[in-house]
């Protein structure tokens, strides 16, 4: 099974997928999807379309010149089967893939190195040249005032609820004390009435 690269965007064309165009001179052009086929028929330049691998490599966004990439070239000359050769090739393939991924990560990290500083300086220059960007608009001020009022009302309501709860507790305790006093008085009256009767 061979996985071909799309002639236009260089993404993989798996078996049973995509379109193949064969020119009069028997040259084969494989496309991963109809988007690439249409662009090819319109004679679009892949280096000028930002979503193609050709653009990314030409613009320096991806690793273009590296020894690990030479291993991925097509070899149409068949080699006589040799078990040891196949074993060493499979080992080498996994090792080369690891090295390529490591180099790509390093390339990306190096490319993105100064972005934070650049963005900060650009934003700073923008704010310095347009100070009105930092000024709050009337609508935002009104919203802020409304939020503050809502917070104050909520805190006032909480205070009212707490004070009501405290007053209820106090009134309950007073009512209990009055009941106890009444009970004591009733007991005293009974004792006195008994004494009087005898």
From Swiss-Prot:
Protein name: Ribosome biogenesis protein RLP24
Biased composition (Acidic residues): 154-177
Gene Ontology CC annotation, any one: nucleolus
Residues passing through the membrane, by range: none
Top-rank lineage group of the source organism: Eukaryota
Assembly and interaction partners: Associated with nucleolar and cytoplasmic pre-60S particles. At the end of biogenesis it dissociates from cytoplasmic pre-60S particles and is likely to be exchanged for its ribosomal homolog, RPL24.
Family, as annotated: Belongs to the eukaryotic ribosomal protein eL24 family.
Cellular location(s): Cytoplasm; Nucleus
Species of the source: Kluyveromyces lactis (strain ATCC 8585 / CBS 2359 / DSM 70799 / NBRC 1267 / NRRL Y-1140 / WM37)
Major site of localization recorded for this protein: cytoplasm
InterPro entries for the chain: L24e/L24_sf (IPR038630), Ribosomal_eL24 (IPR056366), Ribosomal_eL24-rel_N (IPR000988), TRASH_dom (IPR011017)
Function text: Involved in the biogenesis of the 60S ribosomal subunit. Ensures the docking of NOG1 to pre-60S particles. Activates and recruits ATPase AFG2 to cytoplasmic pre-60S ribosomal particles.
MF GO annotations: structural constituent of ribosome
One Pfam entry name: Ribosomal_L24e
GO biological process annotation, one example: ribosomal large subunit biogenesis
Keywords: Cytoplasm, Nucleus, Ribosome biogenesis
Residue ranges of the region described as Disordered: 147-180
């Amino acid at each position: 099974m061979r996985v071909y690269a799309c002639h236009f965007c260089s993404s993989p064309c798996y078996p049973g997928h995509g379109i193949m165009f064969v020119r009069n001179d028997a040259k084969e052009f494989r496309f991963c999807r109809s988007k690439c086929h249409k662009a090819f028929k319109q004679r679009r330049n892949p280096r000028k379309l930002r979503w193609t691998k050709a653009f990314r490599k030409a613009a320096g966004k991806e690793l273009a010149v590296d020894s690990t990439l030479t291993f991925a070239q097509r070899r149409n000359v068949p080699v006589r089967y040799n078990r040891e050769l196949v074993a060493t090739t499979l080992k080498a393939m996994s090792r080369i893939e690891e090295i390529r991924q490591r180099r790509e990560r390093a390339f990306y990290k190096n490319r993105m190195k100064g972005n934070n500083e650049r963005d900060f300086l650009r934003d700073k220059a923008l704010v310095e040249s347009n100070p009105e960007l930092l000024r709050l608009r009337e609508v935002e001020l009104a919203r802020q005032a409304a939020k503050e009022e809502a917070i104050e009302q909520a805190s006032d309501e909480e205070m009212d609820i707490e004070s009501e709860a405290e007053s209820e507790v106090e009134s309950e305790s007073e009512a209990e004390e009055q009941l106890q006093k009444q009970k004591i008085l009733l007991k005293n009256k009974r004792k006195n009435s008994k004494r009087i009767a005898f």
